[in-house]
C-alpha cells in the first residue's frame, strides 16, 4: 500500500458520546460502517443495490485493508493506494456517517432496522432501487418509510437481532441489542 492511516480515538469516547436516543456510541457502530461499505455492492447480499456498485468498485481500486487494533480506546488502521498531497485528507475514520451512509450519522441499530426493511423488500436506500422495485426510498425523517421502519424495529426487538452476527456478535450481545433497540423505540415514540 502507498498509504497507511492510523486513527486513535479518545479514551472514554464511548461514555462521552451518545446517539439521539441516549444510547452510547460503541465500537459496533464503527464496524457496522465498515460492513456497509461492502455489503450493499455484493450480489449475494440481502440488501444488494446495483446503484452501490460503481462507487464500491472505485473504492476497491485503491483499498488494501483495515484492522481494528484496539476497541478501547478505539484504534483503526487503514491501508490504501489512494493518497493526497495534504496528509490530513489521507485519514480513513470509519466514523458511522457519510460517505458510508448517504444521510448523515447513524448507529448500528438504526442501520440494522433499515437493512431488515430493505431485505424485506419494503424500502430501498437509493432512488434507483426504489424506482426499479416500486418501493419507498428509506427516509428516517418523514413519510411512509417511518411506518415500515417502526414495524422492523418491533421485529428487531422481538428477535433481539444482532446484525451480521458472525462479525458484530464480537461487539454486540443479545442484551446489548435489546437495549439499543429499546432506546430507539422509546425515542421514536
Question: Which positions does each model-derived feature cover?
Answer:
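Aromatic- and charge-enriched surface segment that lines or borders ligand/interaction sites
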Residues: 1-46, 78
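Surface-exposed binding/hinge segments that line
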Residues: 8, 47-188
